[in-house]
Amino acid sequence: RPADGLLKTIAEKASQPAFAGIGMGSDSLYLVPFAHNTLLDGYNGHLPWLQSAPDPLSTVTWQTWVEISDATAEQLGVKEGDILRIESSKDSIRAVAYPSPAVPPNTISIPFGQGRKHGSEYATDRNGSESSNVMDILETTTVSGTGSLAWAGTRVRVTKTGESISISKLEGNVRAEEIGILPAEDIIKTIAPENA
């Protein structure tokens, strides 16, 4: 089969990813930056109506947030709204914590798009706790053989600053809750089809 040769060749060229930044110690985390839904890579940061458009998953607006797994947040003693310092060997930024059940353990995610240094007042001159640029801490690690920038090739250290603010978001609680925990939910049990 011709495909066997191609797949074998691809598999032989595979390698483990190379990471740069903070060492592989127990206190370092993987940084996975992602494109902001409306601000993109910051191109639209000067438009206030796009700054105020909520992210479709977190519903955060106007701020740089760091998504952190619930388990990692608990381990670090991080609560929603805590201002975190995210440090790579290149630089550090500050962002507001957003614990999420969707983030893998030992990983943080930060959107591109905020923290611009040039542009309109909507894109610049904002508090570093609310508007930081993840590009400032990305290492310039490249993918072997292609020369492409390894976007998720940076390890970072996260520490609490001792400050906390409210996250500018539209959602309430994203956690799944068992029905029947609150006394007011008992009515749901009484009107269930099997009880009718």
List each language-model region with its residue ranges.
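A cross-kingdom feature strongest in bacterial/archaeal respiratory oxidoreductases
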Residues: 1-196
